[in-house]
């Protein structure tokens, strides 16, 4: 086990395991009924999802520019960690969707790439949809429409005339939607504690049972209000940019969240030309 794995184990009290999905043990009959419920629900959801509006799909060139991992350009070893993580998320909340909070130990744009690939991988399951909420400005913003300025999170927070539906936009990935950060250049994180923020997160988290929401939050050790989102999340993932965080940084970050919601940590390394390498602890 690596030093990072040992640190996570020590501060969470949970054994660190490599990317496979963890399914809680239960009597055989209850497990059978649970799986039958999942299959039934996903079949129903798949029929409903087929009617979702999809204005365009990203070209291979756009996928490369935005650092998406996709089958034509990436090896299986790059895609599998995200599939394993998707399985853990969807199996833990298979019948009612879920909200995943993703935050980094230290500020780094690799978390943006991780979040968009996690949301895209969830959406690859035809019985699921994903919604990415960007709570910080991205280095490379997703092209969501042909309009130069689209309404986003901070616009919704500051304008009470806007509805939640006004800031949810399709992406070039089937079944994946995004709420961009917004048009403001204000880097203040004060909006995280606003009533409008609470309303938005509750709305998108409970409206559709087949939707999985990924919240791309600021670094937990830099923005104190990030932990306010803890109450909305079913699961929490901590990203660790390769070579940029100490064991002390990791321990301090983990202590700020509910241990029961802590899904794991992802060690991320951005590789030129090929994209993103992730190891899930």
Give the positions of each predicted feature.
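C-terminal lobe/tail of nucleotide-utilizing enzymes
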Residues: 2-82, 191, 248-281
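P-loop/Walker-type NTP enzyme "switch/lid" segment
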Residues: 56-83, 87, 94, 105-109, ...
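Short, well-ordered alpha-helices that flank and scaffold nucleotide-derived cofactor binding pockets
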Residues: 87, 120, 124, 231, ...
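Short coil/loop residues immediately preceding or within conserved phosphate-binding loops
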Residues: 97
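Hydrophobic/aromatic beta-strand patches that form the interior of the parallel beta-sheet core
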Residues: 100, 131-133, 177-179, 237, ...
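Glycine-rich phosphate-binding P-loop
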Residues: 100-123
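Conserved catalytic-core segment of NTP-binding enzymes
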Residues: 190-281
